C-alpha cells in the first residue's frame, strides 16, 4: 500500500495514511518528462487502487459509462461512487474502502432490509443502508462512526443517522463531492 501511495499520491479510500513530503522530492528527481501515456496510466491506477477494482472490473465500468449519454469520465466516477462499499466509506461506517468491502462480505450490511454481500452492488437513490440487528455488527459500525474524522463533511447525496446505524442515499452523487483528484 505504501509503495502505491508514494507513487500515486494520497488515496483516501485505500488508507488514511498520507505520503511523506520527502518522497515527493525523490519522485521529482527521477520523473523527467511525463508522457501522455504515463499520465493516463497513473490516473487509471489511481482509480483502480482507490476504489479497489481489478483491471477487468474497471474496463466493465468504462464500457458502461461509454454507452451512457453524457461525459464518460463523469459517468464513470458516478458509477464508482454509487457502489455499496464506497457509500459505506463515505458514510463513515468504514475507515477505508477495503474495510467496507469486508463488512459487506461478512454480511453485516442490509440494503432496504435485505442482506447484501456483494461490495460492488450499485446503490440507487432512496436506498436505505443499515446494519444487521446483531450486537457484533452494531459494535463494528459504532466503532467506525465514533472514530470517523470526516463526519462533518458528509456528501450532500447521503444522510446518516448514527444512533440507528442507518444511512440513506438521497440522489446520484454530484461530481464536486468526489474526493479523488483525477486528471
Curated annotation (Swiss-Prot):
Keyword Glycoprotein belongs to the record: no
Example GO biological process: translation
Subunit structure: Part of the 30S ribosomal subunit. Contacts protein S5. The interaction surface between S4 and S5 is involved in control of translational fidelity.
Pfam families assigned to the protein according to its UniProt record, in alphabetical order: Ribosomal_S4, S4
Source domain of life: Eukaryota
Function, as annotated: One of the primary rRNA binding proteins, it binds directly to 16S rRNA where it nucleates assembly of the body of the 30S subunit. With S5 and S12 plays an important role in translational accuracy.
Positions of the S4 RNA-binding domain: 82-143
Cellular component annotations (GO), alphabetically ordered: chloroplast; small ribosomal subunit
Keywords for the protein's UniProt record, in alphabetical order: Chloroplast, Plastid, Ribonucleoprotein, Ribosomal protein, RNA-binding, rRNA-binding
Compartment(s): Plastid, Chloroplast
Primary residence: plastid
Family (UniProt): Belongs to the universal ribosomal protein uS4 family.
UniProt cross-references to PROSITE patterns, sorted A to Z: RIBOSOMAL_S4, S4
Protein's UniProt name: Small ribosomal subunit protein uS4c
GO molecular function, one term: structural constituent of ribosome
